[in-house]
Structures are given as C-alpha cells and as structure tokens.
Amino acid sequence: MESLSELQNPLLPRSPTHLHGPYPYPEASPAWPCREKIYSYLLGGAGPAHAHQLLDPGSLQLAVEAWYRPSCLLGRDKVKEPRPGSCETSFTEGREPPAGPTERSTEPGQAEEDVAIQTVSYGVQEEFQGQEGDPEEEESDATSTESESEDNFLTLPPRDHLGLTIFSMLCCFWPLGIAAFYFSQGTSKAISKGDFRLANTTSRRALFLATLSIAVGAGLYVAVVVALAAYMSQNGHS
C-alpha cells in the first residue's frame, strides 16, 4: 500500500534524494550558462554596464527559470489566471421588467378618471339637452293640452239649452225665442246622430239667440213701464 506522502503528492518522484530545499522541484544543472548572469543581476553585482540598466519585465521569469528547470515548472495557466489590473466586461441581454403590475396599478386610476370624465360629460350633455328640450317640452305640453281640451270638448256632448230657449220664447221677445228653440231642437238631433260638430254649432246659436231674446225682452219691458208711467203722469196733470 502506498504511503501517505505519495497519496498527498502523486506527481512527485518516489526518491526525493536529488531534491534540495523545501521546494519539490529539481535544481538546474550547474553547467547552465545563464545562471551566473542572473545571480549578478538579482544580487546587485558591481559592474559599470549594470549601474544604469533599467528593469526588464522578463527578468522575473528568467530568475525563476534560473533556479528551476523550465521543464519542471508548475504554475497556473496564464490564459485562465485573472490579472489584478484587468477588468472583464460581459454583455448580457437586459430584460425589461414586466410592466404588468405597473400597468395594472395605473389602470384603476385611469379607469376612475375616464369614469369621472364620462360622468361629467354626460352631466353637461344632459344639462344642455335639458335646456334645449325645455321649450320643446313646453310646446309639446301646450299642444297636448290643447288637443286634449279639444278632444274633451268634442267628446262631451254639447247642451241644447232647451229651458233657456223656452223662457226666451214665452216671456221675452218671442221671435228670437222661437229661433233659439229651433236651434235647440237641431242640437238634440245632431247629438242623437253623433255629429258633435253640428251639435256644437247649433248649441252656440241657440244660446246666442236665447240670450239676445232675453236682453231684447228686458229692454221692451223697461220701455213699456216707462211709457205707462209717463202717460199716467200726463193724465194726472190734466
């Protein structure tokens, strides 16, 4: 069975005798030509050419390669390693928030405003219609009352004024009374036939002649009384 160190470090060789130091990487061979130059560069060796030399960005990689072989270097993938000074920009499709709740929340207020506007417009229209309809309603009411009165007047049978005509014929000026009595009889005949227009006409004529007969008879009676009084006064003086 394998040991615990082999299970923890499966990539390391089984004989670590050739390893040096705490790092599990093999050392470079002493015959490597760039090692002395890297030592002098990193340790600040004296040299007139090195006094004013600028820092090379690739010196760190060379220093690491000087200590360890390039084939045994283990590190992270440069492609996948995030850089501290870099920033990633990702483009995502912006989904607009559903406008359903807001629209639903605003729909009741708009419905109330519409309802209020509609009620106001209806009220104004009703007022205008009422103002415009008042004269028309009055005219229609007047015409309807007139038509109803005419209908009632036509439906009601006219009176024949029989008693008045008899009184005018016997007690007053009898020629006019006889004419009034004649129209009174014509009114009765028209009513029996159902001709209300003719009955109405004859009734008016009978009433007019009876009234005229009474007036004329009253005048005659007054004149006769005055004449008798004058005549008797003359006889008394003589």
Curated annotation (Swiss-Prot):
Keywords: Golgi apparatus, Membrane, Transmembrane, Transmembrane helix. The chain crosses the membrane at residues 163-183, 206-226. Residues 1-24, 78-111, 126-155 are annotated as: Disordered. It is a multi-pass membrane protein. InterPro entries: CD225/Dispanin_fam. Residues 133-151 have a biased composition (Acidic residues). Pfam families: CD225 (PF04505). It is found in: Membrane; Golgi apparatus, cis-Golgi network. Residues 184-205 are cytoplasmic. Residues 1-162, 227-238 are extracellular. It comes from the Eukaryota. GO terms for cellular component: Golgi apparatus; intracellular membrane-bounded organelle; membrane. Belongs to the CD225/Dispanin family. This is Synapse differentiation-inducing gene protein 1-like. It comes from Bos taurus. The lineage of its organism: Eukaryota, Metazoa, Chordata, Craniata, Vertebrata.
